Amino acid sequence: MGDGERAARVFDLLNPIGQTLNTAAVQHYRVEPYVVAADVGGAPPYVGRGGWTWYTGSAAWLWRLGIERIVGLRPEAGGVRIEPCIPRSWRRVDVTIRRPGGGLAITIENPDGVETGVTELLVEGVPEGHGVVAFPADGHDRHVVVRLGSNKRDVPRRDETIGTPNAATA
């Protein structure tokens, strides 16, 4: 929980492109480098060989890890809760989410090289206090800036507002 470095390492382990960085690795892995494998062999002679690439929901789980837990964009009641948990080396992340009524152009700035800790959340330049940014309904994009830093501002999590512990944070 709150360990962006570890979350990124787990993501990299599951990301199929990491299994196919050179010709020898591609020949060993034997499945598509653009599809998440549901399993990777662990017993000889199949150690490291991918399998079951098109038959499961593995890609959806990898997507959720990357977007919802590392980048920290989680859908919530007509908007998006923004709680990044990123590697220290990520100094900036830009994401645009589009919906029929309008989108969110989100920039996460990490000048202090921290993993978590929202110090400022601005929507169209105005401070947002509750951590959930609503989607616009006017067909335009809203510009959102999230600043991370060592002086964490107290932005309540959804589960804190209903009094339950947060067990699902990266």
Q: Residues of each region from the PLM?
A:
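Non-catalytic C-terminal accessory modules of carbohydrate-active enzymes
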Residues: M1-A170
